[in-house]
From Swiss-Prot:
GO cellular component, one term: cytoplasm
Pfam families with a match to the protein in the record: HCS_D2 (PF22617), HMGL-like (PF00682), LeuA_dimer (PF08502)
Cofactor(s), names only, from the UniProt record: Mn(2+)
Keywords tagged on the record: Amino-acid biosynthesis, Branched-chain amino acid biosynthesis, Cytoplasm, Leucine biosynthesis, Manganese, Metal-binding, Transferase
Oligomeric form and interacting partners: Homodimer.
Protein name as it appears in the record: 2-isopropylmalate synthase
Domain of life of the native organism: Bacteria
Length: 510
């Protein structure tokens, strides 16, 4: 059997625990399809028992994917296991992920259980899960702070009861490569099983070592890595799958193993997650950041021009970044636009290209040239707005006096209902956001506001990122438009729409 490092993607489960991130039902389906295109082996679609909305999205993903294994998370509770079974039973490859905490601090303060009670719970619930699933994965939560002898007992119990995947979570990002690698070596040497056991690594990045720890696990026998796209996740995030995959590819001379990811889909996957999560990828991010293949130093530039391998250990094309960014202009027609969409990997029916072409022409009238990044922004922005609960319809601004501005904001929902209100503020942005708050009637507080440009130049499209709390809940929003104020309004409305979507999801609506 061909050996490869399996990728277990938990963007839709652990990744969504990032503060402010709330994927809509439609976004979750689109992300799942893209992850299947990228080639992940297993997709953890969610925690079905947590809410009616989560159950429905896991169920929909299970019914949609045609090649990828779909996994649901369950505590050591029979009701959780039942929920995962019902949500994933129609998946082409259903998998259950059962977990329980094993560290002293968790046993004492969270579970209030003894070690013996934990072992009995593992026995009861892994055995129960095995009645419904051919593939059962078990995780001892906070494994890296668990006594080694007790960890061995927990894993052995899970294996004896039918678990064939053993995942070792560094839940709080506490471990370091040598230590984490030794845990795998110890388990592999001490666990007895008549079946083949796959060992999996799940690392958090609190100390900045998630990818390094995952690679150490591979060096010590792990065959599966859990992670998220762009490394999103609670606190400092999770193992960034794209970084792990490219490390294995570039240094296959050392690791001797690779993933089966379609690496040319890496940048596209990263962009989609960035867009839907409302979190911009840092410019200096490894693999997918804007500066990943940029060279400022004259010496470096000279070397790259003579031979790219002087300062580039991989090509931009490898991860799906096109070097042939031939811009379109205001004289470009529908055929040229359609060919550009095709070259960028978009499969859009001709009848659905009309609105996109209209947006392209509007931008082309304002810019000297429309680049690939502009096109990506148009596509992703349009898809996102089409799926949004609310969209900005019109925005009017007027100077009042003494630095005060008035704003009239009109938005519409999916059903075409119109909502309008106005307000004043010390500047355009404050006035706009006050008006939006009046429309939604929620208590909100702006935490962060940033403007980035989609492309270079004074004629670039603006990309506005906002982070705010609505009724105490953190949410993010992104707005893209050639007009900075309109983009700002879009971002703020999107944040409110995400909050509304989260409320609907908890109530089981989508």
């Amino acid at each position: 059997m061909e050996s490869h490092i399996q990728i277990f993607d938990t963007t839709l489960r652990d990744g969504e625990q990032t503060p402010g991130v709330n994927f809509s039902f439609d976004e979750r389906l689109k992300i799942a399809k893209q992850l299947e295109t990228w080639g992940v082996d297993i997709l953890e679609a969610g925690f079905p028992a947590s809410s009616a909305g989560s159950f429905k999205s896991v169920q929909a993903i299970s019914n949609t994917l045609t090649k990828t294994a779909v996994c649901g998370l369950a505590r050591c509770k029979k009701s959780d296991i039942d929920a995962v079974y019902e949500a994933t039973k129609d998946a082409v490859k259903p998998v259950i992920h059962v977990f329980i905490a094993t560290s002293p601090i968790h046993l004492t303060h969270k579970l209030k259980m003894t070690q013996q009670q934990v072992l009995e719970s593992i026995k009861e619930h892994v055995s129960y899960a095995k009645q419904y699933f051919d593939v059962v994965q078990f995780s001892p939560e906070d494994a890296t702070r668990t006594d080694t002898d007790f960890l061995i007992k927990c894993v052995q119990m899970a294996v004896d009861c039918g678990a064939t995947i053993i995942n070792i979570p560094d839940t709080v990002g506490y471990s370091y490569p040598n230590e984490y690698g030794r845990i795998f070596k110890t388990l592999i040497e001490n666990i007895n099983s008549k079946q083949d056991i796959t060992y999996s690594a799940h690392c958090h990045d609190d100390l900045g070592m998630a990818v390094a720890n995952s690679l150490a696990a591979i060096e010590n026998g792990a065959k599966r890595i859990e992670g998220t796209v762009n490394g999103i996740g609670e606190r400092a995030g999770n193992t960034a799958i794209e970084e792990l995959a490219l490390a294995l590819y570039v240094r296959k001379d050392h690791y001797g193993n690779e993933t089966r990811l379609k690496l040319s889909e890496t940048k596209n996957t990263s962009d989609i997650i960035s867009r839907y999560a409302g979190i911009r990828v840092p410019r200096n991010k490894a693999i997918v950041g804007q500066n990943a293949f940029s060279h400022e130093s004259g010496i470096h530039q000279d070397g790259v021009l003579k031979n790219p391998e002087t300062y580039e250990i991989m090509t931009p094309q490898l991860v799906g970044i096109s070097k042939n960014d031939l811009p379109l202009g205001k004289l470009s027609g529908k055929h040229a636009f359609a060919e550009k969409l095709k070259s960028l990997g978009y499969d859009i029916e001709p009848q659905n290209q009309a609105e996109l072409f209209k947006q392209f022409k509007a931008i082309a009238d304002k810019k000297k040239s429309v680049t690939d990044r502009d096109i990506h922004a148009i596509i992703q922005g349009t898809e996102h707005e089409q799926n949004a609960i609310y969209q900005v319809d019109t925005l009017q601004l007027q100077f009042v006096s003494n630095g005060l501005q008035s704003a009239v904001v009109v938005i519409k929902d999916k059903n075409g209902n119109i909502y309008q209100d106005s307000s004043i503020g010390t500047g355009s942005i404050v006035a706009i956001y006050n008006a939006v708050d009046r429309i939604f009637k929620h208590k909100s507080e702006l935490i962060d506001y940033r403007i980035d440009s989609v492309t270079e130049g004074t004629d670039a499209q603006a990309e506005v990122h906002v982070s705010l709390t609505i009724e105490g809940q953190p949410v993010n929003g992104i707005g893209i438009d050639h007009d900075v104020l309109y983009a700002s309004c879009k971002a703020y409305v999107e944040a409110h729409a995400k909050y509304a979507s989260e409320i609907n999801k908890k109530e089981g609506n989508h």
